């Protein structure tokens, strides 16, 4: 007799056969009633890798034992500590090692990148973003426009969703780039839209923007560690991201930045700081700034070593699993959840995120029948029974099954609780 592919027993079989199942044990889970919480919020804050504590302690021990000499001696010299995460980051984002650097935080890095790559002229001064962009991105873009004496009402172009569910077609994006092309100085686009969970064809967006003569940058906050990326091959000028979501580097973690290799030795204007000075002569303390080649030339201050340690722990797990295997499991998990919702609770939940796996990562954005009031009621009920998603105004519950630590049986637990709530 064939097993029902949407049964609990089939989910258990999928979990037992999962080649990545051991990775779950590498993370610390919050507890609820003496059990591991069912955690679907890796898109907001990833779980703590168990090895993070040891790596942070290693830095603390080195600080205690060596004090300032820890910059130049010890098991992991702080002078080059940021380079310990460089190769792993490059593999995750599809870049050359010298194109990436871990530094600052996302919005700080976005300002640094716009200082270099947003070069408005009389004819070409507009910035194109998606309508409903993450507020910090929009604040950064508006403030950059004002710094140049430009009015956001005139020079900020927002591409409105062309679907009732709030998503954007590639046709709409292409049409906007074509329509405004001669005015565009910069196209700034997300890898994944934070509210809808929609993933975009980044290579195509980069090609279209550059064909119009615009610089192109990506905010990869919800894409890095979630979907395969190929930043070098896509030809994007720059990208920025955070590490506290899918890369599990902890609250307020150090951010990440990509600068394409074609800019590695350029004389682009930049906001400079001493740690961006070339390493061989940095400690001569000379007044002339000589940038390090590649993305490291945009560094400002010495790296936050304690904050880099958890990222190092997480990247070891990504290297152990590999992005292709993580993506394959992610598509299975999210597809399984989609089937469960359509089959068992279609009258309760509407999926906002596109059904095409190429247009989403692991996150499904959900609206609850009955609107915001019912949505909040379900969200709070799920919290009360130890199932944690997150809420985004005005009416979206986001559920993100993360392949590093979520299981197929977690999806059944979620849907069973939705059924219980709906039947009450």
Curated annotation (Swiss-Prot):
<protein>
    <recommendedName>
        <fullName>Kynureninase</fullName>
        <ecNumber>3.7.1.3</ecNumber>
    </recommendedName>
</protein>
<dbReference type="InterPro" id="IPR015421">
    <property type="entry name" value="PyrdxlP-dep_Trfase_major"/>
</dbReference>
<dbReference type="GO" id="GO:0030429">
    <property type="term" value="F:kynureninase activity"/>
</dbReference>
<dbReference type="GO" id="GO:0019805">
    <property type="term" value="P:quinolinate biosynthetic process"/>
</dbReference>
<feature type="modified residue" description="N6-(pyridoxal phosphate)lysine">
    <location>
        <position position="245"/>
    </location>
</feature>
<feature type="binding site">
    <location>
        <position position="107"/>
    </location>
    <ligand>
        <name>pyridoxal 5'-phosphate</name>
    </ligand>
</feature>
<feature type="binding site">
    <location>
        <begin position="134"/>
        <end position="137"/>
    </location>
    <ligand>
        <name>pyridoxal 5'-phosphate</name>
    </ligand>
</feature>
<dbReference type="Pfam" id="PF22580">
    <property type="entry name" value="KYNU_C"/>
</dbReference>
<feature type="binding site">
    <location>
        <position position="302"/>
    </location>
    <ligand>
        <name>pyridoxal 5'-phosphate</name>
    </ligand>
</feature>
<comment type="pathway">
    <text>Amino-acid degradation; L-kynurenine degradation; L-alanine and anthranilate from L-kynurenine: step 1/1.</text>
</comment>
<keyword id="KW-0663">Pyridoxal phosphate</keyword>
<feature type="binding site">
    <location>
        <position position="219"/>
    </location>
    <ligand>
        <name>pyridoxal 5'-phosphate</name>
    </ligand>
</feature>
<comment type="pathway">
    <text>Cofactor biosynthesis; NAD(+) biosynthesis; quinolinate from L-kynurenine: step 2/3.</text>
</comment>
<feature type="binding site">
    <location>
        <position position="244"/>
    </location>
    <ligand>
        <name>pyridoxal 5'-phosphate</name>
    </ligand>
</feature>
<comment type="subunit">
    <text>Homodimer.</text>
</comment>
<keyword id="KW-0378">Hydrolase</keyword>
<dbReference type="InterPro" id="IPR015424">
    <property type="entry name" value="PyrdxlP-dep_Trfase"/>
</dbReference>
<feature type="binding site">
    <location>
        <position position="106"/>
    </location>
    <ligand>
        <name>pyridoxal 5'-phosphate</name>
    </ligand>
</feature>
<dbReference type="GO" id="GO:0043420">
    <property type="term" value="P:anthranilate metabolic process"/>
</dbReference>
<dbReference type="GO" id="GO:0009435">
    <property type="term" value="P:NAD biosynthetic process"/>
</dbReference>
<feature type="binding site">
    <location>
        <position position="274"/>
    </location>
    <ligand>
        <name>pyridoxal 5'-phosphate</name>
    </ligand>
</feature>
<dbReference type="GO" id="GO:0019441">
    <property type="term" value="P:L-tryptophan catabolic process to kynurenine"/>
</dbReference>
<dbReference type="InterPro" id="IPR015422">
    <property type="entry name" value="PyrdxlP-dep_Trfase_small"/>
</dbReference>
<dbReference type="InterPro" id="IPR010111">
    <property type="entry name" value="Kynureninase"/>
</dbReference>
<keyword id="KW-0662">Pyridine nucleotide biosynthesis</keyword>
<feature type="binding site">
    <location>
        <position position="222"/>
    </location>
    <ligand>
        <name>pyridoxal 5'-phosphate</name>
    </ligand>
</feature>
<dbReference type="GO" id="GO:0030170">
    <property type="term" value="F:pyridoxal phosphate binding"/>
</dbReference>
<dbReference type="GO" id="GO:0097053">
    <property type="term" value="P:L-kynurenine catabolic process"/>
</dbReference>
<comment type="function">
    <text>Catalyzes the cleavage of L-kynurenine (L-Kyn) and L-3-hydroxykynurenine (L-3OHKyn) into anthranilic acid (AA) and 3-hydroxyanthranilic acid (3-OHAA), respectively.</text>
</comment>
<comment type="similarity">
    <text>Belongs to the kynureninase family.</text>
</comment>
<dbReference type="GO" id="GO:0005737">
    <property type="term" value="C:cytoplasm"/>
</dbReference>
């Amino acid at each position: 007799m064939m097993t029902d592919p949407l049964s609990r027993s089939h989910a258990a079989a999928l979990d037992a056969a999962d080649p990545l199942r051991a990775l779950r044990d590498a993370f610390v889970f919050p507890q609820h009633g003496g059990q591991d919480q069912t955690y679907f919020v890796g898109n907001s804050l990833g779980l703590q890798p168990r090895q993070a504590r040891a790596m942070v302690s290693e830095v603390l021990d080195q600080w205690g034992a060596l004090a300032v000499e820890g910059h130049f001696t010890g098991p992991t010299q702080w002078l080059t500590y940021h380079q310990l995460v460089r190769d792993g980051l490059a593999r995750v984002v599809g870049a050359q090692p010298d194109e990436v650097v871990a530094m600052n935080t996302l919005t700080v890095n976005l300002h640094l990148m716009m200082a270099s790559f947003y070069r408005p002229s009389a004819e070409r001064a507009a910035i194109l973003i998606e309508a409903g962009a993450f507020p910090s991105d929009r604040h950064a873009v508006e403030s950059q426009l004002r710094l140049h004496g430009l009015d956001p009402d005139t020079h900020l172009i927002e591409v409105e969703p062309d679907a009732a569910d709030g998503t954007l077609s590639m046709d709409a994006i292409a049409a906007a780039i074509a329509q405004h092309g001669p005015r565009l100085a910069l196209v700034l686009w997300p890898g994944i839209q934070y509210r809808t969970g929609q993933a975009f064809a980044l290579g195509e967006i980069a090609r279209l923007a550059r064909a119009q003569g615009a610089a192109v940058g990506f905010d990869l906050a919800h894409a890095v560690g979630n979907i395969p990326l190929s930043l070098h091959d896509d030809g994007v000028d720059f990208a920025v991201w955070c590490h506290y979501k899918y890369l599990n580097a902890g609250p307020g973690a150090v951010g990440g930045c990509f600068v394409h290799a074609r800019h590695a030795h350029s004389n682009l204007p930049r906001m400079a700081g001493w740690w961006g000075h070339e390493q061989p002569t940095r400690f001569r303390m000379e007044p002339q700034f000589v940038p390090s080649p590649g993305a490291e030339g945009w560094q400002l201050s010495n790296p936050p070593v304690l904050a880099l340690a958890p990222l190092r722990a997480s990247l070891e797990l990504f290297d152990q699993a590999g992005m292709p295997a993580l993506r394959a499991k992610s598509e299975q998990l999210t597809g399984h959840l989609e089937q469960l919702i359509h089959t068992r609770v279609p009258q309760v939940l509407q999926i906002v995120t596109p059904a095409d796996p190429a247009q989403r990562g692991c996150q499904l954005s959900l609206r609850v029948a009955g609107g915001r009031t019912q949505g909040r009621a379900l969200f709070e009920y799920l919290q009360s029974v130890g199932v944690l998603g997150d809420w985004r105004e005005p009416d979206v519950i986001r559920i993100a099954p993360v392949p590093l630590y979520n299981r197929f049986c977690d999806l059944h637990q979620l849907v069973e609780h939705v059924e219980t709530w709906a039947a009450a």
